[in-house]
């Protein structure tokens, strides 16, 4: 059985491909689509950017709640640059409003890898992620990505703090997911970074026509 998101995606896709892409009359449909993404833990960046673009063209239609949902969904797709793209489409005045200001701050903490500070700030603003299904799990996935490319070994306690101090069983779940192992000293072996460094051979193909044109211009 198709989810509401899947059912809406086809219709929204038609809207975005047609001449009505930036018709403000479509905002209600697109805003419902954003809410569906939040509830069903789904994601459609193109549609969300279209909403923000419509807000740029039609400031009177701006919806703070919808914009907050879009920003939070973009954070769930780190390390991709979606959050930066969305942020750049929001005017400075609206960036200073609650809850957008708080979400931008949380995003900055994540992008700069201040993970413990992120969880502390989120704890003070739990209402921000109400209705954003899977938000914390997506953030933890991003944090594990950063840990995986940064550390060879990490203390169990530090990893738990970076993941927001979940239950030990949850930390174990993330360790198992990425194949990380703990030794007797409480150190977790992440990855041998030296083994993952591989030289790249760069081969550039130049056809005869390109060479002949270069020779002709040099004569």
UniProtKB/Swiss-Prot annotation:
Domain of life per record: Eukaryota
Coiled-coil residue windows: none
GO biological process: formation of cytoplasmic translation initiation complex; regulation of translational initiation; translational initiation
Subcellular location: Nucleus; Cytoplasm
PROSITE patterns, alphabetized: PCI (PS50250)
Segments forming domain PCI: 43-205
InterPro entries: ARM-type_fold, CSN8_PSD8_EIF3K, eIF3k, PCI_dom, Transl_init_fac_sub12_N_euk, WH-like_DNA-bd_sf, WH_DNA-bd_sf
Gene Ontology cellular-component terms listed: eukaryotic 43S preinitiation complex; eukaryotic 48S preinitiation complex; eukaryotic translation initiation factor 3 complex; nucleus
Sorted UniProt keywords: Cytoplasm, Initiation factor, Nucleus, Protein biosynthesis
Main subcellular location of this protein, as a coarse class: nucleus
UniProt GO molecular function: ribosome binding; RNA binding; translation initiation factor activity
Pfam families: CSN8_PSD8_EIF3K
SS bonds (residue pairs): none
Assembly behavior: Component of the eukaryotic translation initiation factor 3 (eIF-3) complex, which is composed of 13 subunits: eif3a, eif3b, eif3c, eif3d, eif3e, eif3f, eif3g, eif3h, eif3i, eif3j, eif3k, eif3l and eif3m.
PANTHER family the UniProt entry points to: EUKARYOTIC TRANSLATION INITIATION FACTOR 3 SUBUNIT 11, EUKARYOTIC TRANSLATION INITIATION FACTOR 3 SUBUNIT K
HAMAP family cross-referenced by the UniProt entry: eIF3k (MF_03010)
Record's function text: Component of the eukaryotic translation initiation factor 3 (eIF-3) complex, which is involved in protein synthesis of a specialized repertoire of mRNAs and, together with other initiation factors, stimulates binding of mRNA and methionyl-tRNAi to the 40S ribosome. The eIF-3 complex specifically targets and initiates translation of a subset of mRNAs involved in cell proliferation.
Record-stated family: Belongs to the eIF-3 subunit K family.
Name of the featured protein: Eukaryotic translation initiation factor 3 subunit K
Organism annotation: Danio rerio
Biological classification of the source: Eukaryota, Metazoa, Chordata, Craniata, Vertebrata
